[in-house]
Each structure stands twice: as C-alpha cells, then as structure tokens.
Amino acid sequence: MIPHSSAGVQSWGQPLYAVYTGTGRADLSQPLGQPDRQSEQPSMPVAQTQGRPPALIDLTANDGDVLEREPPAKRLKIDVHAGSVANDGSPASAGVGESKSTPGATTSKPPSLSWRARPVWSFQSLLSEIPGSAEINGESAAGVVQDLKPPPPPSFSGPPWKFAPTDIIASDSAGEQDGASAKEVQTTPYHIETPSVAPVIRGEKVADFSPWMGNHPEDVLNEQTAKQGYYDRTQVSQNESNTARPSLYAQLKHRSGLQILSSVFAAALEKRQGHNMVTAPSTFKPPPRVTLTDNKREAWLRDLANPNVPLRKLSRTIPHGIRGRVLLDQCLTKWVPVGRAVWLAKCVGANEIRAFKRKGTSGALTIGLEAKWVRDWTANVQQFLEGVITSCGVADWKMKVTYAVNLTSRLFFEQLLDHDQYLEWFLTSLEAAPFNTLPVWLLMLGIYWSNILRYRKRGRRLAELLLDKLQLAIKSDSAPSLRPLIDRLSLHIRKLTLEHTSSMVLPQSWEKYKDLLSSCLNLNDNVHRTVFQILAERNARVQKPPKCEGTTQQPPQQRVIQLFDSICSSHDITSVSAASLRAIDDKAALVLKLLEWAATPFRYGVSRVYTGARLLRKWKIAGVDVDTCIISFLGESQMSDQLNMDNVYHIVSELVRSQTFSVGKYLQWLMAKGVADFSRSSDHQPLSGDLALLVQLPVSRLPEHVHNLRNTLLHRAGVEPSKEASTIAILKASIAERLPRIFGSVATSAVSCDPLPSDLTWTVKSELGQWIRRGVTEFGRDPRRAFQGLHSTTSAEHFALTPGEFYTVRDILESFGDLSILADVLKQATVCNDGIVLASAADTVNYHFRSFCVIGATTDLFKRLVEAYARLKRLGSTSLDLIFSLIDLGLRLPGELNTVALLRQDLSRIESKSSMAAPSPLSDHIPSSFNENDPLFLLKLDQLLSSASGIDESTLDTIFNVLIKQLESSGGHAKFSVNEICRYLSYLRPFHPKRFDTMIVRWVCGLLRSSTGGILSQVLPPLIGVGCVTIQAFVFLVRRLLKSDNKISNQRDLRIDLLQLLVPPPAGQSRYFDLVTYRFHLSRKEFLFKHPEEAFDIIRDAIALIDSESQEGNYRQVDLGHSAMVLLQILLTKNPESAVRHCSEKLIGQHPSAVTVLTRALDSLLGLDSKAGGHLFTSNDTFIFIPIDTGPATPDISVAEKVIELTNDFSLPFCQLKLQLLFNAESKGNVRNEIVDVMFKAAVADSRSRRSNWVGLVSLMSHDAVRQVKCHDIRERAEKNFFATPLFEESPDGCSSFAADNSSSLEAAKLYLAIIEKLAYSIPDVGPQAVVPVLTEKLDLLLQRLISMQASCSGTTELSHGVDAEQMIRSRTQFERALAFWFSALLRMIVLHRTAFSVPSAAVRPNALPEQTRLLISIFCISLARLPDSVLRLFPAADYFPHSMRAADCRPCPGILLQTHALDVAASLIDMFPDEARHQCARYLREKCPPFARVQNDSRFLYLLGPLGDSPSSNITLPVSIPSPAASGSTPAPTPSGNSTGGFSHPQQPAFVSGVPPGLPDGLNCAASHLCLQYRGRVIGAYPVRPWELLEDAAPIAGTNDTAVSLGYFDARRVRV
C-alpha cells in the first residue's frame, strides 16, 4: 500500500505533530474542497501491528479510528474482503513491488512480507535510506512504485509520467521538504489521487490508470483468465464489412454527394463543439464579508495562517474591518502564508471595487473611484514596506523584511498595485535611502529590475540614481567600510550598461558621471571598451555644447602658439620642441608660425628671438629643413608689412653665429631667383624681405669666398659694402673714446658718434658686439691684472672694470639687443672684486631673466656671482647691494633655494649686528657735528656707517633728517645726487628697520599732502631703486590716502606722476643707468608683470583727468595720452588675453577719453591709424611716441572690414577688442547692423575656407555684442538663413521627381549649421521660443515629402522602365541622401535648442503640447522608415552628413547609426516633455502610423514611449529595453526586410493575440499587438481580465463557470486535466 501524503506519514523517527517553521509556506497536495469520490466506499480498518519502539503508526485508517498500540497479529486472514483493501487505494501486489524496489535499504530493518496487504516499513522510510533522497509526496511515491513494476512489452511505449528522470524526482522531493511538516487535516477522508500528468480521455477517465477496486473483470480469477489471461476484446458486429467504399461510392457519384458528406461532417463538428463549449453564465461572485467579533476575527486570521484550513471554508466568513495597512500588518503578525495573504487581499479588493458599482455611479466615475482606490491601496503597501524596513534592529527583523518583500513583490506581480506609482515610489525611496538601509533596497532592486528598465522614463532615472549613490559612497569618509556596497553598486551599473545601454544615454549628466562609469567597467575587455566608447559618442551627440568656447578642441596652430608662449614661464625648450613637432605635421608651417610669433607686434620682449633660435637649432637636429623654411618665409613679401622683420633678421644672425643657417644656400637661392639684379630707384626705398637679409648677415665667421659673393650681390642690389666698413670704424672709435681703458687710443681720423644710431644692421651690430666682447675678455685676461687682483684690492680696482665702464658696455649691448654677447660680458665681469659691478651684473641677469634662461646662461652666471660674493666675503668687503641683488635673482631660480637661504642668513646677520651694536659715547656728540653744509659730511657718514659701533635712535633721526633735506633740495642747489642720497638711506635702514620704515612713510605722506608734492616724481624712483619703497606699497598708500581724506592738494598731478612712473623712457633718451636707476627699471618691470590689474586701474584714473582739464593744459593732455597709450601697448602685448579682459572691465564704458586712448593704442598695434605711421614696434622696452588726437572717432564699416581682414592667430584678441569698441561707439543703429553683416559675411567666408578665426572674434566679445536683439545677432542670422534654405529643389520640368543636383543648397546649409554650432554657447538657458515652431514645421515638411516620395515611387514602379526607371532611381537616391542630411541637420538643431523644448519654456506657449507631439511623431516616423538604400542606417561620415559613395561602399561602418542617433534625440526630448505628449504620440503611432514606418514592429517604440497611459494593466509581459544596435560595437549589414533593430539579433516578440484574421496587414500582427487595435469593428488584443477577480476558491461551492468573465467569450471548452 502506498500511503498518501495527506495521511501525514512521517519519516523514521519523526515526531507526530507538525512543526511550524515560520516560513508561512505549505504544500497542499490536493486542492481544498475537491469532491472526494472515494468517501462513499465502505472502509474497514486494517489491523495494525505493534512493535517495539520505534513503532509504526498507521495513519491510513479512517479519521474515526483511535491510534492505539496493539501487538501485531500473527497471521492475517486470507479471505479479507476486497473493499477493505480498496480503501487503501493500492493493489495487492504493491507490497511485493515495494520490497523489491529498495536495493539500497539496509538489512537491519525487518524484511517486507510479500503476502501482507501492507508492508511493515513505510515507503517513506525506505526512500529515506537512499542517499540524497528526501521526503516525497504521494505523487512522487506513486511514480516510483509505478517505475518499479516490470517493464511493458517493447512494442508499447510507456505513459509519459512513468520513468521520470531522477532530477525531476529530486526537485519534487526538494519542494516537499518545506511543506512536509504541514500535514493534511485529519478529518479529510483519504481517496486515491489521479496523477496530474496522466492523459485524460473522454468520460473524465484517465488513460492507463485503473485502481484496483475488486470488482473489475480483470480481478475475477477463473479458468480462462488463469490459462489465457485477460484481455479487453472489442465487440465487432457481424454485419460490418471490411470497407465502406461500396456504401459511400454510390453516394459520392451523385452531384450532391460531396455537399451531403460535408454537411454531415459539419454537423458532427458543430455538435462536438457545442457539447464541449462552456455555455453556462459566469457564476463568479467575490466572497462576502461578515461582521465578526474581535475574538472570532482573531480566530479567523489564525485559521487563515494555518495552511491546513481550506480557503473555501474561510471564504464563507471573511471579517469586515481588515483592509489597507491593517490587512498587511495582520498578515505579518500572524505569519500568514504569502499565497493566502494575497488571496485575502484580492477578496477585500474585489469587494471594495464592486461596492463602487453597487452605489449606482456612472461608468466613468466608477473607473475613477477604482483607480483612486488602487492608488490608496498602493500607498498602504508602500507605507507597510517602509515601516518594516525602518524597524531595523528589532526581533525577527530579517524574517519580517523577507516576508514583507515577498508579499509586496507578489502583490506587484499579481497586478494588484499601481505599477507607475509603486515604481516611482521605489525609485524615490532608493534615492533617499541612507547607506545603512541601501543594501535592502538594492536587494529589492533585483526583483523589479526588468520592470524598471522596461521603459526609458524609469531606466534613465535608475542609471543616474545608481551613479549618484556610487559617487557619494566613494567620496564618503567611511569609503573603506563601504567597499561591499560600492562593489554591489558597481555591479548593478555594469549590468545596466551592458544589458540596457540605451538607459545610459544621459544628456544632462553624462559629463558628471562618465569617469565614474568608466571605473565600473573593465576597459581592458574589448566588449566593455567598445560599449563605453559608443556610449560616450552617443551621449556626445545629444549633449548641448559647453558654455565656454575655450573648452572646444583648439586648432593645431593655436596649440603651437600656446606652447611658444609657455616658454616665457616654464623655460623648457626641450619639451616644447618635441610637443611642437608632434602638434603639426607640416614642418614648413611650423617654422613659419614660429617666425611669425617671434616677429609679431602682438607679443612682447626680445626673449622671443632667442626662443626661436634655440627651437630652430633643435628642429634642424631633428631633421627639419630649417634653411628652406626660412628662405620661403622671407620670400613672402606680404608678411613683411605686418611683422617686425628686425626680429627675424636677429634670429638668422644668431643662427649664422652658431653655423646653423647655411648662408651659401641662401645666396644660391637668391641668385637663382634673380633678385640680385634689383636696383632701387631711391636710396630710401626699402628692400624686399628676402633681399634685406643679405644686408643683415653677420660676416665675421663667413668663408672668404662666401664673403666676397655677398659683397658682389650687395653691389648689384645697389648697396655699397664699403659703407658698412666705414660705419663700423666710426662706431668703434666712438665706443673706444667712451672706454679708453679697454680699447685704448683710436685713430684721429675717426669721427665720434654718440649716441649710437638706432637703424644699424645686424651685420654692424654683430661685428661691434663681438669686438666689445673680445676687448672685455682681453682686458680681463691680463696675467698681471689677474695676479694683482687676488692680493691687492687697490690693484684690482685699478685694472678691473669700473662701474662706469660696465654701465657703458651694458648700455651699448642692450641698445643693440644683442643679449648673447651681453651674457659673455657678464661672465667676464664676475671676476672683478667691485661689489657695485657685481651687483649691477646680478641686476642685469635679473632684468633679462627670460632671455638668459632661453640662452642657458642664467644658472652659470648666478653661480659665478655667488662665487664672487664668497671671494669678497673672504676679503672682508661684504656688499649689501650684492646680497640684495643675489637674493632677488636666486628667488627666481627654483634650484637655488639653498643658496638663497645662506644669503638671507648673511643678510640677517649683518642687520642684527648693526641693530644690536651698542652706540659709543662719542655718538652723543655726533648729531651736533652733522650738518649738510659740512664739506666732510659724506666722509663722516661713511665712517659712522662702516664703524662697528651702533647708532641710537636720536642719531638715526638726525642723519635721516639731514638726508631728507638733501632730497627735498635735489632740484636746486643740492650738493649730492639723488641716487647717492638714497643709497645712504638704504645703508641707514638696517640699524633700526621699524623706526626707519615709520619715518619714511610719514615723510612720504607729508609730501603727498603738501603743495610741494612735485618733487615726489624725482625722489621716488631712486627710493624704489634702493629698496626703501616698493611700487606696490606706494600705490596702496596712495589709494588709502585718497579714500580716507581729501586733503591731498595735488591729486591730478599725483595721478599723472603715478602713471608716468610706470612708463619706460622713450627710444631717443639716454640709457646710461647706474645701479639705482637700473634697479628702479627692474622693479617697474616686475610690477607690470605681477600686478597688471593695478596698472590698468592707474591708467583709468589718470585718463579720467583728461576730460576734467581745461584747454590751457592741452600740452599736459597730450603728454598724458602718450604715456597711457604706451603703457597700454606694453600691457596688451605682455599678456593679450588677460589684458583684453581688463580693458573690457576697466576702460570700456568708463570715460570717453579712456575709449579714445584705447582705440588709438589698438589702431597703432593693428596698423589702422594713419597718423601713427604704422605699428609701434617694441624694442628693448622702449617705444616711439607718436602724437595722437583725443577727439572722438566715428566707426566706419571699412574699418570693421579691415579689422576682420587683419585677424589672425596673434591679433585675434586685439581685433576682438577693436570690434567691441566699434559696437559700443555712439552711432546710428544701422551702423551696428552693418557691422554685424560684415562679421556674418566673414564667418561664412571663414567657414567655407575651413578657418576658425571668426569664432574668436565673436566668442570673447561682450555679452551685448554677441547677443543683439532679434535677428541682428550672427547666430540668429545664421539660423534664419538655415531655415530659409529649401529642403528639396524641384526639377525644372515640374514633375514629382526631385532635382538631381541640390548640392548648392546643402553646402549652404552646412555652412550655416557650422556657424550655429560654433556659437551655440550663446544660446540662453531658457531657449529661444521662436525656434520651436520653425523646427516642428521643418520636420513636418520633411515627413510629408517622405510620404509623397514613397507614394510616388510605389505608384510608378510598375509603369517605369528603361531610361525613366534609371532616372527615377537616381532621383530617389538623391532624395534619400538629401533626406538623411536634412534629418541629421534638424536633429542637430534640436539638440542645440533643446532647452527651448523644456517644460518651463513650453508653459509660455499655449500650443506647446501639440508641437511637442508633432515633433516626436516626425522623428519616429522618419527614423524608422524603411528606405530602399537604408541611408538612415549608414554610419554618418565625419560630421555625420551623408556623402556620395559607390554602391559597393554602401555598407554600415562601426559607430552610431543615424537612426540610433535620432532615437537618442527623441529620448532626450521625452525626458523633458510631459507625459501627455508622450501618450498622444503613442496613441497616434499605434492608430495612424504611416505604412512605410513600421514603428510598432520596433521594440524601442514601447521602450521610449512607455508606460502608456491607456494600455491595459493585465498580465502582459512587455519587452524590456534592448541594447542599442550599435552598443555591441558591430553593426550588421542592412537586410532587405528592413529590420531596423540591427546589432544583436533579437527574436521577434510573439503575438499575444490569438485568432487574428490572416488578412490583417503586417503592421497589426506585431509585437505591439497587445495595444488593443481596432480592426473591422472588432477589438484585437488580450482581454483585460481584472486581476482582483482572479480568485481561486472564491465561492463555497465550485460551479461550472466559476470565473470573473464567462469562458464562452474565449471559445473555452471543458477540458479535464
């Protein structure tokens, strides 16, 4: 006998009672309430045996039997009535089969008796002995027993449920373990259970399953059955013939025979169908609710938690008052099994919903009330889950969370919740979850993963949410402890990226998260790397351009210019040289750009010359043909007009000295060119650039034949070489006269020339420089001088360079600009022992620091100067001037900080020694002897300062007052020079620094307030030179005094003096600078370099005085204008970008005079001022003053055109500033419009020639200049012209075909679009509202043209042939490529103006919603259109505009498809559009979609537009978001079927609708068929069954049609399974 699982048979040694594990799960092997067909059978208890413990307990008896322990019967009766065994439901031979089926059983247990009706050991116990087996239910046991029977004959195949695989048995056994302890109710009578997998035959019988009842003919044992066996013989009538042909043939011969036969078969089928159809009406009624007391309600809930109580019994008394949050809490408290809890929720919900209908409300109101109730119920579920999750730490929290998650997920997937509300709440909760509860929400995320990522609306939000959480976790202080959480978040992000790539298209936040996303992927993996690259490209295409134009990629030439400018601060020639060679492939263009940079008037300083020379030397070593590049540069005559060619000749001179430039090659080229026959008509006519180099070449190191050839060419060019020799001889005599100790006497015939002329050629300058260097070197190499210099200071001073001689040599070489020779002279000067000369040498190195760093002499000179200082220190003649100079120079050398520290220690030691020395008694009588009239004043002061004794404060005050009086009288009858007095003041300061600073500040303030403040301009430079006052401190003091009080009598003169304090001397002025004056120039240069903003403030304040002065001060106005213009030019050329910004902020719009001075300065730099006579080229920090007219200038259109023509990579900031001045000038409005027209034409011209200078002209101008009102802006004009360009040009014959060549309109549209993209940063955040309707109309027109073209092609396909067919094919191909271009261009415009489509912007327009819907419809229909050439599926070339190609080349390239890009743009719009626009677009596309656009066949349609508001909320599995076609990195070739999914091969979604007529179009039988389409008056789609009425065991008595909807509506039949 096989015991049934409901009988509660326990395994060996198990307790008799059921143990509840708290899981709330139970396995009911029999449906509750199923009628028991065996209950009416007579039952007789089988005598059971009693053995020693453990005893066998008979649970197979009837319910009324008492379990008693009786001794086993010795012998069973043989003639037991068959009915007694029939109640057990097993044949008599079961015991035999059972005993033979346990080969694995141990021998310790008693063997089974084959003659007993029931085995001694239970079948469950036998199975428990088998390794790996567990408790199995009755069905599994029955299957095993059936399996152990002898196999049937080979000719018959066994039943499908027999010989089940072991894995199925194991799975059933494993599933039984959870519910094994929950036994069946004891009062349920036992009955035989039919196997669930047995085939059902007519009459509710089961094939090959006939339990032994004792009354079957097979069970009757007689002689026949004993001998022959039993078989079921079919009774055949004797009148039956072998064939029906004779009877049917006669009927078929008649004409109506077939109809009769057909009607007979049809009637038979109709009767069968009518018999099998469910015709009874629906008997479904939700179980009613009754009012119960609290005790009965609790008892009912306990019964509900007990899985043994059938639900049909509980459905009679469902108590009132259990709803909402209370229902869920009760289920959690009572541990109601999840399935039974869901059953209760459905019962309550069905009653609540049906209550709305019973109130007599209308249908629409009922639906609204039902939806409201579902939303409230969903909110209760949300609160319930939140409460369980937030109760972390309480008892059984893990079990409660598990139960709550299981229950809510079951309610979700049973369609008992509002999915939109629930998932939105889930994402909101996940976003707000702290780190301590985030793991729970991540576990729940796995449950709703596919539902969230089914639509982009939720998928994008989830992607940003996870990335934000990961970013916060990584940046958290407790990041190490959050490592598991970080890994889990990274895993989710990686899975989302690889499986749902489209959800990672984040137009708003890609730049924020792209680095974080790349860290989550394994970029070493090809798949991960390809997905990330394509994803980055997709995001870049849908992103709005950055606000700043500077973030865009710079052209190589501008990048090279930045590298050249960086040398001024980094001084790294090697790295810049290598980077420049990598930046530009054309080396000739690179050399050309370097020479332009060195000679442009828009850069400052002579250091560019030596930078260019060193770079050219390195490039020549690297293999660049520098000579040819330089010669070709000189041959361009148009370049010499805009450049300072003297710098170019200087570079060539340096190259000739180092033998880097081939003079012979240049002369050969000059002879081959034929310019040697050039003859000037006038001596004042300048030579051309290539010929002028012949005059500038240094000749000292040239071979004799090359020298002679040069002289010959000069003679033919009209230049006499003898003039060079005479000029050199005159200049040598003049220099020798000024330096007799170095060069000795000169010939008396030479004529002195002082000062030196400024137009000397580099041939003369180079010869004189080398002569001076040779003379200084020979002067310092005299052995007698060198020997005496080491022992005797007097001899050293007699034979070494004196300060005057050093100043003269330095002045000559600086006027030449020959700093390489000056570096050699400074090297020779370091051997002398004069502290003044050494300090001056250190100041010279500091003044030309950038040039010497490029030359490579700075470090060596500094080390030599430090050695000279150490030598002086050993000799006991320490100089404070030298220490100050060395410290200032060492601070600019990063590698000499230790040396600077030692120098500062020496300086502090000297200062402390002076301040701490005790004054001698004689110092009390010193003040009375100090008098400025004393002829021995300086001698006494030197003795006092050089003595070891200190100076008290009274003595300091006396000496300070005496020196100050000398300074104040320096303009008249002063006995001492100002520089000398200031030097003594600097020597006096170390004794009492604080008191001295206080006294000097008090004196300066007194001068500022007095009427004699004019002397301040005379004494301030030397005070700055000796270090007693700094320029920055003085400027700060002046501004503080001007703000504090107005007692300064001469504010106007003070502002002018302050301005002129910063202006360098003019070119003609003598440059003989002593130590103090040179240091002042050094301080001014450093101030202009470090504090340019304060310099602009000084210029602004000074220029403001021009408007307030009277006519009598006209000369002063001109002088002020000169100074301001020169200083502006210096500041503009030192740092153009920042200087232009400062000018826009501080000068423009302040004063008319400021604008005028700035205009003149710019005109001088740009060469626009006719009065200026050309450019003002800087040379050695000097400028040529040119008178300016301070009157206002009226802007002219020709000036704007010329400024635009002058725009290049160097003049760009100055042209920007000039155009800005033209815009801001007070003139008529039409002038502004004309200027805008000029700039727009320049933009079009530059775009056509692929230049980008116009972008810089517009990008850095002021806000008002960039955005003019309405269409006067350049970008708006480009947009206007872009939209005015016709989409398609009609053919001249007027037929429906399109013009074969519309390239002109396409090229024009490309130019306008390029301009719009370059200026896209100027689009406001709110977006221009006028663009939206225009874009919508353009896309509508594009769609209409596509529809008409499709109709035209389909209508003329059959009629066209021959030449007409070829012409039509060409026209169609041209149309499709134009369509692809315009579609991509309009998509780009949508991306640029995406902010105009946002919800705040759309709220201003009343028709915003229809425009948004039309825009989405157009994008979907065009992108998913199936064109013959599949141009929308081709990878866009370069700027993703289609290009002409051969048929063989029409293959998809790796990258983003234009179709995918279009859908990405649609996704970015959907992210901003309201849900109503999305719903209207979906409604239109599913009802009125054009036939050529198979939108509904594409799963991306549902992904982008879902969830649909009016879609049924039934159990329909919608397709999840599919990875992009390009996400895999490989794009398949376009197939003729027009499958637009591409990428991975995705199977077509199955049609969820049965019974679709075969005549339907293909567009209806598709993946979107669940959208309930209307066809011929019938609704085709899944029937929306109410999930609340899908109740099992709803009624106490099961009916024939116990369903919520009549099964007859679905052609359902009675099928017994």
Curated annotation (Swiss-Prot):
An example Gene Ontology biological process: regulation of transcription by RNA polymerase II
Composition bias type Low complexity, residue spans: 1523-1543
Localization in the cell: Nucleus
Residue stretches of biased makeup (Basic and acidic residues): 66-80
Swiss-Prot/TrEMBL keywords: Activator, Nucleus, Repressor, Transcription, Transcription regulation
A Pfam family recorded for this sequence: Med12
Chain intervals with Polar residues compositional bias: 40-51, 99-111
InterPro entries: Mediator_Med12 (IPR019035)
Region (Disordered): 25-114, 1519-1552
GO cellular component, one term: mediator complex
GO molecular function, one term: transcription coregulator activity
Superkingdom of the source species: Eukaryota
Assembly information from the UniProt record: Component of the srb8-11 complex, which itself associates with the Mediator complex.
Family recorded in the similarity comment: Belongs to the Mediator complex subunit 12 family.
Role played: Component of the srb8-11 complex. The srb8-11 complex is a regulatory module of the Mediator complex which is itself involved in regulation of basal and activated RNA polymerase II-dependent transcription. The srb8-11 complex may be involved in the transcriptional repression of a subset of genes regulated by Mediator. It may inhibit the association of the Mediator complex with RNA polymerase II to form the holoenzyme complex.
Identification of the protein by name: Mediator of RNA polymerase II transcription subunit 12
Organism: Aspergillus fumigatus (strain ATCC MYA-4609 / CBS 101355 / FGSC A1100 / Af293)
Lineage, highest ranks first: Eukaryota, Fungi, Dikarya, Ascomycota, Pezizomycotina
Name of the coding gene: srb8
